[in-house]
From Swiss-Prot:
Compartment annotation: Plastid, Chloroplast
Keyword Ribonucleoprotein part of the UniProt annotation: yes
PROSITE patterns to which the protein is assigned, alphabetical: RIBOSOMAL_S11 (PS00054)
Chief place of localization: plastid
Keywords associated with the record: Chloroplast, Plastid, Ribonucleoprotein, Ribosomal protein, RNA-binding, rRNA-binding
Gene source species: Oryza sativa subsp. indica (Rice)
Family as reported in the entry's similarity comment: Belongs to the universal ribosomal protein uS11 family.
Domain of life: Eukaryota
A Pfam family matched in the record: Ribosomal_S11
Protein name (database record): Small ribosomal subunit protein uS11c
Listed GO CC annotations: chloroplast; plastid; ribonucleoprotein complex; ribosome
Keyword rRNA-binding: yes
GO MF term set: rRNA binding; structural constituent of ribosome
Amino acid sequence: MTKAIPKIGSRRKVRIGLRRNARFSLRKSARRITKGVIHVQASFNNTIITVTDPQGRVVFWSSAGTCGFKSSRKASPYAGQRTAVDAIRTVGLQRAEVMVKGAGSGRDAALRAIAKSGVRLSCIRDVTPMPHNGCRPPKKRRL
């Protein structure tokens, strides 16, 4: 019997260097700015923090999911605190305005973390959208 000739290239493409947390290695390094705007979006399921420069261009963003929290832990106040610390430490802000949107549990914890981080806050605004009796709200859950 003749021996099978080994194939030089395999059909299956192998991704080299991609790990489970590949997002962190593929992310561009954040610009360092001294003055900016911190947007805190606190929903009932997650907390998202976006840091922009004064013109509104996004410099860095972080969420409870990217900080390593999964499922219901993303909605915790501790996740909001860690998210805020991660965003500020990466960018290196010194002066900032804070805009808070939403009524999630990470909202107050994120504000406390921003205040304790040493960033000088010029103003804190609540920009939560409030309807003037617009759309009908969804029906209440029956458990």
